[in-house]
Amino acid sequence: MHPQGSNRQKRNLGLWSAAGVVVCGMVGAGIFTTTGLHAAELGSGWAVMLVWAVGGLLALCGTLTYIELAALWPEAGGSYVFVRNIYGPMSGFVVGLSVAIVGFMGSIAVVGLTLGAYFQKVVPSVSPDTMATVAVLVATLVHCFGVRESNAVNQLGALFKIILLTGLVCWGFSVDATAATPPPSVGGDPTGLSSSVFGSAMAAVAFAYLGWDNPTYIAGEIRNTKRSLKWGMTLGMLAVTALYLLVNWVFLRAAAPHEMIHPDGSPVVDIGRFATVRLFGETVGGTFNILILLVLFSTLSLTAMVGARVFYSMGRKGELPGALTILNRRGSPVIALAVQCAGVLLLIRFTGLKDLLESVGVILTVISGATVLGVILLRIRRPGLPRPFRVPLYPVPPVIYLLLTVWMAWSVFRSNPTSIILTLGTIGVTLAVWFGFSRRHSRPPSSGDTAA
């Protein structure tokens, strides 16, 4: 183990690594579940495509805004570092611990449980909880071998996801789909949708787009930070958005929105398998189910890598025990990885998939909105601050992001009051830890860190 004083992360990652982190982190459970859950409620192919397009716009606005902050503070930690430097140590701690516990541990548990559910269709005797536990343990061990090794896994995962989705799109458009016509000729008009229905679907789509900010959490390990983050995040996000729209078009060729329900009236959660079975037959559908398992494990692996860096960053600030900053000889934050793994296993054991999805989506939406607002506050308070990168068309991207964030959060809170309790509960726990321990140990930001 390295002594704590030498625990500086090396910048081993480049532009394509940053893009790979975006692709690998974004493409996961969401694209293979969300459309099936909400298509029938949306009622038309146009509405399905519109909600995914607006989700892409939201992610683009968030990406451009986060790049400005990441260029100011090119260190590991993402939203935690940004909020800490803008709003102060307490706010940064609340955000950091919320992201670490709910955003990353929760997301890892969600992907793990989804992976377990898909795996049970291959091996019915293995429960989703058991398979999720095995997947989390394997991913954690991989990342303990070092940054280069885990980065190789992530880049291979990103390449595999692009090949899989591109293959699905090309093959999907090559067959004669008689179940439904392409979205432009599907009946229905999105202007007839209620705001609450569209907002609820948007919240689910936003979860599918989560991951566009992943490179900001490992910025301390990225070379030529300004160029790599700017192009890596933007290209990765645009590539995923294009793939998402094309994949959903394929889903709509397989079935009209009103057909994406089971005979008992429940939505088709496994929309990937459902669509491929209708387009290509049972054999291909079963094979696609196995490929989805690989996609889900790749996403789980990437999220585990990024999430541990939040604990690492908070440990360096003195807000969590210094043991979390310990790196092994290969440069991996092994203690942070172990703590994260233990937390994920507890979530898998004691929570359900639905509750996790709702809480993760709401809390991360609120956090990202607060972070984006910080860009506007910095422009007002420190207009002369040297900025290596400036948001194009400012203030349009951050304003669009904030408006959509408030609307989505309001829609979720209205439809599911439990999300309010979970959100307030998370904030309460983080504040208790702050006043009970972290406030006394937190080190103030250096003069070069604080910008607000």
Predicted feature locations:
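TM-loop-TM module centered on a large, flexible mid-protein loop between adjacent transmembrane helices
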Residues: 81-82, 88, 121, 232-301, ...
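C-terminal membrane-solvent junction of multi-pass transporters and transport-like membrane proteins
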Residues: 323-334, 368-419
